[in-house]
Amino acid sequence: MTQKLDTLQAAIERVIGDRIVHLVRDRGELTLTVKATDYAAIGKTLRDHPDLGFEQLIDICGVDYSGYKDGGYEGLRYAAVSHLLSVQHNWRLRLKVFAPDDDFPLVASLTPIWSGANWFEREAFDMYGIVFDGHTDLRRILTDYGFIGHPMRKDFPVTGHVEMRYDPEQKRVIYQPVSIEPREITPRIIREDNYGGLH
């Protein structure tokens, strides 16, 4: 495994070169971080270069780093993380890109390179609000079309903004503001010598 990772790391360093922001090797996996401006071009290189040959995209997910390291993280907030597979070389790579603008997270779409990125990018858009430039059908995939916000963002309230219910007078489903009141629950601790027959 180590020799295979050495070979892959050397190939990435040789082919991608100075466009690498970070190349981290941890727990038997490589993570390549690139600039948003180079993201699509590097994706195409990773797929087409014979020494790399990542012909399959397995997954794309969004990440919100706003609370990372207990708030000690000071980098960009949103990232798109792609997981790539090379069947011909039998190796994997994690490709990470940070959106340069936290207020409007925008990165290039990988759908022209790997068509399987379509629904994964839609999910990252729906859950995190990351916009994939060049995606031909970027719309919500898991939440309602009228949903407000992006539920996997760390600043999204756990209760949400609105709730859905059936209104018998209107004979249809309606949205209304959330009626749940925030409360603090303090757990009750029972300290008995013979609790649960453990002694």
From Swiss-Prot:
Alphabetical list of PROSITE patterns matching this protein: COMPLEX1_30K (PS00542)
EC number: 7.1.1.-
Catalysed reaction equations from the record: a quinone + NADH + 5 H(+)(in) = a quinol + NAD(+) + 4 H(+)(out)
Its job: NDH-1 shuttles electrons from NADH, via FMN and iron-sulfur (Fe-S) centers, to quinones in the respiratory chain. The immediate electron acceptor for the enzyme in this species is believed to be ubiquinone. Couples the redox reaction to proton translocation (for every two electrons transferred, four hydrogen ions are translocated across the cytoplasmic membrane), and thus conserves the redox energy in a proton gradient.
Subunit structure: NDH-1 is composed of 14 different subunits. Subunits NuoB, C, D, E, F, and G constitute the peripheral sector of the complex.
Family: Belongs to the complex I 30 kDa subunit family.
Full protein name: NADH-quinone oxidoreductase subunit C
Source organism per UniProt: Leptothrix cholodnii (strain ATCC 51168 / LMG 8142 / SP-6) (Leptothrix discophora (strain SP-6))
